[in-house]
Amino acid sequence: MIQYKEKFIKSFNIKESPSDFELNLFKKTQKYSRYISWIPWLKMLAVCNSLSMYSTKSTSDIDLFIVTEKNRIWFVRFFITIIFYIFWVWRKDESNSAWNFCLSFFACENNLDFSKIAIKNDIYLYYWIHYLKPIINKNWAHEKFIDSNLALWIKKDELPKDNKDYIISVKSYQLKAISYLFGFIDWFWYFLYQNIFKLLSPKTKKVQRPFWVIISREILKFHDKDKREEIRDRILD
């Protein structure tokens, strides 16, 4: 896939370094990521799509990809949504999308092999992973994600050198204390997950071809306008 890099860069107007506007968006992401970094079951938060590729527009939102602990995907999504809603930085719809956070892609740490949701010759998915910029990276979650996707021809030595320039520090002792504090809440949530969500999952699981929307116990993907096929055909033409 690396052979298509020049065409991909031209197609999306990707810059070698971020503009001042994009740097401010990264600073905003770092700021609000600190407000959620205490969540023990949050393993990685990364910027993806246009901002990670340095190809934003003045109306761009901030797309986030979030990795959670196994069986905690709905719990983490709930907390992040509430916190971002309180700070008024959650992208609810098109009317407030500019510069706000789009919480449209979550995955559990035990299901990071995206070859399962790739289309044939998935050029966009390759570069989506290639340019991913982690902000929160607990227990080497980003490295584990890359290792899980080597089947998609991802090569570590070809990743942009600045991919990890935006990672914020997370104090482990605070996470441990909060884990104890939230022990009961976690137990109660896991009880609901095991006894209620699993019963409902056959009815709630939803996958639209070609993986535009995925709602399951391990992946939540809410992009209802997936253009990967269109992008692939344009670049391969």
What is each stretch, according to the model?
Residues M1-T59, T68-D237:
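Catalytic core of pol beta-like nucleotidyltransferases
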